[in-house]
Curated annotation (Swiss-Prot):
Compartment(s) where it occurs, according to its Swiss-Prot or TrEMBL record: Endoplasmic reticulum membrane
PANTHER family xref list: MICROSOMAL SIGNAL PEPTIDASE 23 KD SUBUNIT SPC22/23, SIGNAL PEPTIDASE COMPLEX SUBUNIT 3
Membrane topology: Single-pass type II membrane protein
Protein name: Signal peptidase complex subunit 3
Its job: Essential component of the signal peptidase complex (SPC) which catalyzes the cleavage of N-terminal signal sequences from nascent proteins as they are translocated into the lumen of the endoplasmic reticulum. Essential for the SPC catalytic activity, possibly by stabilizing and positioning the active center of the complex close to the lumenal surface. Essential for viability.
Organism per entry: Kluyveromyces lactis (strain ATCC 8585 / CBS 2359 / DSM 70799 / NBRC 1267 / NRRL Y-1140 / WM37) (Yeast)
GO process annotations (BP): protein targeting to ER; signal peptide processing
Self-association and partners: Component of the signal peptidase complex (SPC) composed of a catalytic subunit SEC11 and three accessory subunits SPC1, SPC2 and SPC3. The complex induces a local thinning of the ER membrane which is used to measure the length of the signal peptide (SP) h-region of protein substrates. This ensures the selectivity of the complex towards h-regions shorter than 18-20 amino acids. SPC associates with the translocon complex.
Glycosylation sites recorded in the entry for this protein: N125
Amino acid sequence: MFSLNQRFQHVSSLALSCSFLVIALIAATSWLQLVKDNVFELESQLSHIRSATRFAKQKRYGGSAVNPTEVSKIRFNADFDFSRLFNWNTKQVFAYVTAEYEGDENPHTMNEITIWDKIIPSRDNATFTLSDIDAKYQLWDLESKITERPLTFKLHWNIQPWFGFLINGETTGSKTIELKKPVDKQKGK
């Protein structure tokens, strides 16, 4: 006969294997439901993107008194509906707006900066119409220049499921603008 220890190992092994199978089925069916709902083609509208750019001499922005860096504060309007991202396996959705641009030193390198983010805990809070909102985070680059190059603003999302892997994507609406160079007040004197 089998000992008590062997029986326990057999039962726990079977239970663990069945649990992993159920979790895999949950993750697969919730992902298939997202594909069926066409969530990877969600539309959003980013508009009225404005900036106030200044020179920063603080060390935290990579600048100094001799070599200041450009820092830009963004204001924008956004309109999006993430209710289709919620199904029975969605715990919450993380939405964020990024600014994407090419680097000066290596023009084939794309830089991406997050300027705004929001955690959406339920389907009831998934529709937004933001007007004239300030970005949470300022734009600045290690190369000390963020202006006079095209920046493409996009709205991204990540789904945190109860079971399974994180699912991420971006909406189809994007907006490209070029920030204006700030006026250096010390050079004008």
